[in-house]
């Protein structure tokens, strides 16, 4: 049995915002945690598409999107940090210049080479592109979880890549056996 003071590692987990989430930035969100350690945490909101699609974004960065079925794929709000920067969450390929490999078979890439590969049709088959990320300083996320701000569950890539954005919150809750209609923002302490 782990010590109550043992550090927890939530890398490759979903954070599911509780109804009582104090920060409206994260209300109703599911965050995929790409990294969590003693220095803090970094994740991407996976269920908040913004009013821009891949074709429009690629035009803005002077890339021609040759794979037309991807043109209308939404870009997502990844979080409030560095919202002008792109973050690509995709199946692990190990072939891009600036990727963070996440245990569980995914990578988060911030270099333009992944977008160039997508534009040519040679990029990852499954990916989402976010603008910005969510970040927490050391101990901050653990404190928010302790205040009943988040639920955590092992991530399922199928939810990220194959479930429509508007259904990802409910799908993540179902991983915990929770009916979204029955979720309360009130914390109970024995």
Curated annotation (Swiss-Prot):
List the signal peptide residues. none
Against Pfam families, the record matches this protein to: DUF179
Task: Name the InterPro entries on file.
Answer: AlgH-like (IPR003774)
Ranges that cross the membrane: none
NCBIfam families, sorted: PRK00228.1-1, PRK00228.1-2
Q: Could you tell me which PANTHER family the record lists for this protein?
A: UNCHARACTERIZED PROTEIN YQGE, UPF0301 PROTEIN YQGE
| Name of this protein | UPF0301 protein RSc0675
Q: Whose protein is this, by species?
A: Ralstonia nicotianae (strain ATCC BAA-1114 / GMI1000) (Ralstonia solanacearum)
